[in-house]
Amino acid sequence: MKLPAIRYASPASIEDACDLLSTDEDSKIIAGGQSLLPVMAMRLAQPSVVIDLGNVPGLTRLEEVGDYVRFGPMVTHATIVNSPAVAKHLPMMAAAGRHIAHPQIRNRGTLGGSLAHGDAAGEWPLVLLALNGMVEVQSVRGRRTIEADDLFVGPYMTSLAADEIITDVWIPSRPNGWGYGEFARRSGDYGLANVAVVLSTADSRISDVRIAVGGAVGKIQRVPDAEDVLNGSELSPERAEAASEAGAKSLSYISDIHGSAEYRHGLVQELIRRTIVEAGART
């Protein structure tokens, strides 16, 4: 389908973008356009003004800052996947990014756009939650920081206010103790289930476990029932199995033409088990 007629704005600063966004509640930000343009073409969204961030300086940064990697919201998926800094400090992010669609999409789509879209099958929301990252947002009312645990509130829903723009994404360095798994019918398809795990070990005991699940559930979410089975225990195949069973049982699954809730339950349980084992092997 063709796009409808639209009004287009290309601000030269983040402040100008915030001003434009605040003056019209039906306006929308466009970054890479890989989420917004398809829904506009299907007439599922009809913004009064499309505000393009492409000419705002400083939004494509990717840099190491202390124990964090800092990303601008306009950094593309391809840039992240191919970044030496990401490969060194956030290898799980590089691994997850290779599952995103196809090269053409990865060359255009952006980190900030994916996080703001809040798709439960999206790789970046899952990674941000598992790695305990955070986003900085700005509006005409000022700036604030949103922790990953507070960002995703429902299907395609985030805690961003309608007039807020993501300006920075901060993710703590995590070179080890991680696992990522995703199942899709074909390479480049949306994942029917994806799981990310990070954990630490000290004196043979597991700690600081974060397990995030997407794709099979209505929103990106952590799995505290699985985390509780692991924290304070010794990692073993039996413990990984017990955690995966407890975690998978605690979730509510979507059911559609691509897979039943029962099918997705099985996928999630196996992916949790595998990613726990992978994370343990990388500690």
Curated annotation (Swiss-Prot):
PROSITE patterns: FAD_PCMH (PS51387). Induction: Expression requires the presence of nicotine and molybdenum. GO terms for biological process: alkaloid metabolic process; nicotine catabolic process. Nicotine dehydrogenase activity is inhibited by tungsten. It catalyses: (R)-nicotine + A + H2O = (R)-6-hydroxynicotine + AH2; (S)-nicotine + A + H2O = (S)-6-hydroxynicotine + AH2. The keyword Oxidoreductase applies. It is found in: Cytoplasm. Its EC number is 1.5.99.4. FAD binds at A31, G32, G33, Q34, S35, T110, L111, G112, G113, S114. Keywords: Alkaloid metabolism, Cytoplasm, FAD, Flavoprotein, Oxidoreductase, Plasmid. GO terms for molecular function: FAD binding; nicotine dehydrogenase activity. Its cofactor is FAD. Its main location: cytoplasm. Residues 1-176 form the FAD-binding PCMH-type domain. Heterotrimer composed of a large subunit (NdhL), a medium subunit (NdhM) and a small subunit (NdhS). Component of the nicotine 6-hydroxylase, which is involved in the degradation of nicotine. Catalyzes the hydroxylation of the pyridine ring at C6 to form 6-hydroxynicotine. Can use both L-nicotine and D-nicotine. This is Nicotine 6-hydroxylase medium subunit. It comes from Paenarthrobacter nicotinovorans. The gene is ndhM.
